[in-house]
Structure formats: structure tokens, C-alpha cells
A protein has these predicted regions:
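Hydrophobic-ligand-binding modules of eukaryotic lipid transfer/binding families
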Residues: 1-11, 101, 130-133, 137-140, ...
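Beta-strand/loop substructures that line and gate deep hydrophobic ligand-binding cavities in soluble
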Residues: 83-141
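Glycine-rich portal/gate segments that line the openings of hydrophobic small-molecule binding cavities
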Residues: 39-86, 90, 141-157, 168-172
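Hydrophobic ligand-binding cavity/cleft-lining segments
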Residues: 1-42, 46, 169-173
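Well-ordered beta-strand positions in beta-sheet-rich domains
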Residues: 5-7, 63-65, 90-92, 107
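A generic structural signal for beta-strand entry/edge sites
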Residues: 1, 48, 75-77, 99-103
Length: 173
């Protein structure tokens, strides 16, 4: 299994990050110019809810549906875990209150965890069938950029400039 984690300290109140999370369906698309769709099919992001993300990064079209498997929230912490329908991708967003604002962590994990067969399947998935989409550096760079955008959103209320959809879709695979 491949696990990528990017974290950032944001000098904005935890309440701002929690409000951003509470409006996730709308905020996901505004978060990055590469994010083009987010559908909360149940209207919320509670555990068991169905969700769909779509983003196009460097011409690669990532269109993923799945289920929220964990959703914890209190006055000092939130954690939301998404599992793809194919059960080969997990995305975790976690926020914590700090003395200077909030800490945000974004983790994306890919692959099967089943002993022996998991390693074989991961090789086939990542090295044979989906080699272009399994570009770990591209995914990590996108996560870093997402964190930078979130920093600007929560500290300055500044959203990134949108890229026209037709431009994003040109050559998307």
C-alpha cells in the first residue's frame, strides 16, 4: 500500500476549518481550480454516506466514488475518512485545534492490504493497468498545493482563480 500524507499549520481558528468542512460539497470545488465536482449523494458526510470527487490534474482525470467510513467531530478535532468503491483508495482529512490556529492533515492511501495477493494486485494496478494515474509525485504535489490553497482560504478568505473547464478537459485521460 502506498500512503502519502501532507500536513500544514494554519493560523486561522479551528472554527473556520470546521465551518469549511461543514460546507464540504461546495468548498471542495472552490478549494482548487483542478477540482471540478463533488457530490454528497446523501446530502451529508456522515459515516455511511456516498460521495463522488472529480478533479483533473496535469491532464489526468480522477473521478472517484465511494463511502465515508469514519466521521468524527468535536470541539477540538475532526477526522473524515473516505473509501473508494473499488476499495483501493482511502482519503483522510483531519483537523486539530492548536494554540496558534489549526493543524490540517491530508492523507491518501492506495492499494490493497490483503497479504500476498495485495502485493500482486498492487503491482498489476499501479505498474500495469493504471501506471499513468499512479503518479505518486503528481499526487503528492497536488496534495501540497491543496494545503496551500486551504491556508489561503482559511487565513485570507482567498480562493484560487478557476481554470475554465474546457481547458482542464483538453487532453484529459
Amino acid at each position: 500500500m502506498i500512503v502519502l500524507t501532507e500536513q500544514i499549520e494554519i493560523p486561522a481558528s479551528y472554527e473556520k476549518s470546521k465551518a469549511w468542512t461543514a460546507n464540504f460539497e461546495e468548498e471542495f470545488v472552490k478549494w482548487s481550480p483542478y477540482h471540478i465536482e463533488c457530490n454528497l449523494y446523501n446530502g451529508n458526510y456522515n459515516a455511511g454516506s456516498k460521495i463522488r470527487f472529480r478533479e483533473i490534474v496535469m491532464g489526468l482525470d480522477y473521478d472517484v466514488t465511494g463511502t465515508i467510513t469514519e466521521c468524527e467531530q468535536d470541539e477540538n478535532h475532526f477526522r473524515i475518512v473516505f473509501r473508494s468503491d473499488k476499495k483501493t483508495a482511502f482519503i483522510t482529512f483531519e483537523g486539530k485545534r492548536t494554540k496558534t490556529g489549526c493543524h490540517f492533515s491530508h492523507t491518501e492511501a492506495f492499494g490493497m492490504t490483503t497479504p500476498v495477493i495485495g502485493a500482486i494486485m498492487n503491482f498489476l494496478i499501479f505498474k500495469v493497468f493504471f501506471r499513468k494515474k499512479a503518479n505518486w509525485q503528481l499526487i503528492r504535489d497536488d496534495m501540497i498545493l491543496d494545503n496551500r490553497y486551504l491556508y489561503d482560504i482559511l487565513t485570507e478568505g482567498k480562493y484560487p482563480e478557476r481554470i475554465p473547464l474546457d481547458k482542464l478537459l483538453t487532453g484529459a485521460k
